[in-house]
Amino acid sequence: MKITVGCGHLKTDDLDQILSFVSPNLAILDSRSVCGIEHLHQAATLSLSSHNNGFNLSKDKSTEVLLYLTFQRQISKALSLSGVNKTTKNVGWVSFGKASIDLSEIITEDDSVISIHNYDFSKLAKDVDISLDNDLKQKIIMTRTAVLPVQPR
């Protein structure tokens, strides 16, 4: 199954309209919960792998992406940390399979919105020393993402 990721600025602040695009195969998330495009690719790949191999925590691949991005086992916590809300201005997205909708209706693509510089360490990784080198901080976050399946329940 093909995985496509992207990011950009929201064109609307109509939360209902934005959420109407979300489906089991399309995740739209707050870009501040993504520590670089590699992190988004990693979460998408792990989500697909978990569903293909029967160790998924969520019934939908799109929700599973949020769990991996935030290294959470509880959907409600993952949604509060990375879900789109009234204050979200920039988003990342993951599509599994052929995209059947046109996100350009609600998103202006801009690759710069997802970066380690925009990652919300204060909300998602308070214990990471922000004075560390950016590559090291990203490795820490991506390691936490990778070990989610082996964490005790």
What are these regions (language model features)?
Residues 30, 60-74, 105-113, 141, ...:
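Residue-level signal for functionally critical sites in structured catalytic/ligand-binding pockets
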Residues 83-153:
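Glycine-rich, aromatic-bearing surface loops/beta-hairpins
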Residues 17, 42, 72-74, 138, ...:
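Residue-identity detector for glutamine
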Residues 4-61:
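N-terminal interaction modules that seed assembly of large macromolecular complexes
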Residues 2-4, 25, 88-92:
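Short, surface-exposed beta-edge/turn micro-motifs
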Residues 15-18, 78, 103:
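Hydrophobic side chains in well-ordered alpha-helices
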Residues 37-99:
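Ordered, amphipathic secondary-structure segments that act as subunit-interaction surfaces
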Residues 18-23, 82, 106-107:
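Hydrophobic, Leu/Ile/Phe/Ala-enriched alpha-helical segments that form helix-helix packing faces
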